[in-house]
Regions:
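N-terminal Rossmann-like NAD(P)+-binding subdomain of aldehyde/semialdehyde dehydrogenases
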Residues: 1-124
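Conserved small-residue-rich beta-alpha loop and adjacent elements
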Residues: 108-174
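Alpha-helix C-terminal capping segments
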Residues: 143-154, 177-179, 197-203, 221-223, ...
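Short internal beta-strands
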Residues: 154-164, 268-274, 281, 352
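Conserved NAD(P)+-binding/catalytic subdomain of aldehyde/semialdehyde dehydrogenases
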Residues: 180-258, 262-267
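A glycine- and small/hydrophobic-rich beta-loop-beta segment
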Residues: 262, 270-346
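C-terminal core of ALDH-fold dehydrogenases
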Residues: 322-437
Length: 437
C-alpha cells in the first residue's frame, strides 16, 4: 500500500491507475463475447445449451434449464435456519428503504382546458444476472430483485450458472424465492446475457438486464445495451475512507481490507489529515494480514490499487475524494455530517465509526449496486427508478389550443418544418380565414 502526499498531480496519477481496471480496457475479449451473442441470437437454445456444456460442464435441455419448485423446496431444506432468518431480516430493511423511492403518476389541469402529467409505468420484464462459481452472493440477489418488485415489475427472470452437479447454490435459490423472482434459469456467462437480450425458446426476452458478473458478462451487457436497457457496467469494488486524527486505526484498516478482499483489482484508499493515523493504519493492516483467509488477494489488491494519501487539511481531502468518486466512501472525522454535505461524488456514504461499509452490503437497506470507476460523478445506486419509465401526458381542449395555435405555427415555421405547422393550422382553417382582411 503506497503512502503519498496528496497533490493534484498525485490524484491524477491515482485516477489513471484506477481507470486501468475499466472493462473498456478488455478489448481482447470482445470478439469472443460478440461471437457468443451472435450465436445465441441466431441459434437460440441450441447455442445456449452448447455453451453451458462447454463452459459449465453441465448438460441442460428445455426440461431442466428452468429451476423447479421441487429444487427450490430442496434448497430451503439445505439452507441453515439462522441464515434464512438473516435473509428475511435484511429483506425487511431493503424493502422499507426502496419503498420510499416509489414515484407516483401526477396530473395537473387548468380552467382553460389543459391537462399535463407524467404517467409512471413499471418495466414489463426484467432479467437479473447472478454470478455462480465458488463465491456465492445471496445479498446481490436481494439487492437486484427487491427494487424491481417494489417498482411493480410483473415478470422477474433470474439466470445463474449451475454448479458441476447441475444445481444452483441453495442460498442463491432461497434468496431469489424470498425476494420474489418469478422464473430462475440455470445458465450463466455471456450466453445468459444473450438469451435475456434476444430471447430463446426457453428463456423470454426482457426489457432490462441488471446484476454483476465477470468480464464476459460485463462486455456482453455493454454489447446488448440499446437492444435492451442495462443497469451499468460494474467494475471492481472500491472503498475510500476520509479520516482525521479522531478515527480509530483498528477500524479503518479493517474497513479498507473488507473491500480489498473482493479481488486483485479492488481498490482501497485512505485520505487523511493525520500522519499518525496513516502510520497506525499501516501497522493494523500488517496485523490483519496474518489472520485473514484471503491474504494473497488482499496483498495483490493493496499492491496495485491501495493508497494512503496525506492531505494538508480536510478541504483538500474532500476535493480529492470528489475527484476520485469512489463506489463506497466512509467519513470518520469530527463534524462528519458537515463533511458529508461537501461530498458531491460517491456511490454510497457511510458516516461515523460504527457505519462500516459491510453494513450497507448486507443489511442497512440502501442498495449495494453502486457506480464504480469514477462513474459516481454522474451515476447513482440501483434504485426503483431503474425499473420504471415515465410517459409525458398532454391534453388540450379545442379552445385551449386555439388560444396559442398561432404561436406554435410561428415556432414550427421558423424551423422550416411546414408539416408541423400545418398539423396545427388545419384545425383552425375556418377561423383563421375569417380573420384575414
Amino acid at each position: 500500500m503506497r503512502t503519498v502526499r496528496l497533490t493534484k498531480e498525485s490524484t491524477k496519477d491515482i485516477l489513471e491507475n484506477l481507470l486501468k481496471r475499466s472493462p473498456n480496457n478488455y478489448g481482447k475479449f470482445e470478439a469472443a463475447v460478440a461471437n457468443i451473442l451472435a450465436n445465441v441470437k441466431e441459434k437460440g437454445d441450441e447455442a445456449l445449451f452448447s455453451y453451458t456444456k462447454e463452459f459449465d460442464k453441465v448438460e441442460v435441455i428445455p426440461e431442466t434449464i428452468r429451476v423447479t419448485e421441487a429444487e427450490i423446496e430442496e434448497a430451503y431444506k439445505a439452507v441453515d435456519a439462522s441464515l434464512l432468518e438473516v435473509i428475511r431480516k435484511a429483506l425487511v430493511n431493503i424493502r422499507s428503504y426502496h419503498e420510499k423511492q416509489r414515484q407516483n403518476s401526477w396530473f395537473t389541469s387548468t380552467e382553460k382546458g389543459t391537462m399535463l402529467g407524467q404517467k409512471v409505468t413499471p418495466l414489463n420484464r426484467v432479467g437479473v444476472y447472478v454470478p455462480g462459481g465458488k463465491a456465492v452472493y445471496p445479498s446481490s440477489v436481494l439487492m437486484n430483485i427487491v427494487p424491481a418488485k417494489v417498482a411493480g415489475v410483473p415478470h422477474i427472470v433470474m439466470t445463474t450458472p449451475p454448479g458441476k452437479d447441475g444445481k444452483v447454490n441453495p442460498s442463491t435459490l432461497v434468496a431469489a424465492k424470498e425476494a420474489g423472482a418469478d422464473e430462475i434459469y440455470k445458465v450463466g456467462g455471456a450466453q445468459a446475457i444473450g438469451a435475456l437480450a434476444y430471447g430463446t425458446a426457453s428463456i423470454p426476452k426482457v426489457d432490462k438486464i441488471v446484476g454483476p458478473g465477470n468480464i464476459f458478462v460485463a462486455l456482453a451487457k455493454k454489447a446488448v445495451y440499446g437492444h435492451v436497457s442495462i443497469d451499468s457496467i460494474a467494475g471492481p469494488s472500491e472503498i475510500l475512507v476520509l479520516a482525521d486524527e479522531t478515527a480509530n486505526a483498528h477500524y479503518v484498516a479493517a474497513d479498507l481490507l473488507s473491500q480489498a478482499e473482493h479481488d486483485e483489482m479492488a481498490s482501497a484508499i485512505l485520505i487523511t489529515t493525520s500522519t499518525e493515523l496513516a502510520q497506525n493504519v499501516e501497522k493494523e493492516i500488517e496485523g490483519y494480514l496474518k489472520v485473514l483467509s484471503r491474504k494473497e488477494i488482499i496483498e495483490k489488491s493493496l499492491e496495485n490499487f491501495g493508497y494512503i494519501l496525506i492531505a494538508e487539511d480536510m478541504d483538500e481531502a474532500i476535493e480529492a475524494a470528489n475527484e476520485i468518486a469512489s463506489e463506497h466512501m466512509e467519513i470518520v472525522t469530527k463534524n462528519a455530517f458537515e463533511v458529508m454535505m461537501k461530498v458531491r461524488n460517491a456511490g454510497a456514504i457511510f458516516i461515523g465509526e460504527y457505519s462500516s461499509e459491510p453494513l450497507g452490503d448486507y443489511f442497512a437497506g440502501p442498495n449495494h449496486v453502486l457506480p464504480t470507476n469514477g462513474t459516481a460523478k454522474f451515476f447513482s445506486a440501483l434504485s426503483v427508478d431503474d425499473f420504471i419509465k415515465k410517459s409525458s401526458i398532454v391534453y388540450y381542449s379545442r379552445s385551449a389550443l386555439q388560444e396559442i395555435h398561432k404561436d406554435i405555427i410561428q415556432f414550427a415555421s421558423s424551423e422550416q418544418l411546414t408539416a408541423h405547422a400545418n398539423s396545427i393550422a388545419v384545425r383552425f382553417e375556418e377561423e383563421d380565414k375569417k380573420e384575414q382582411p
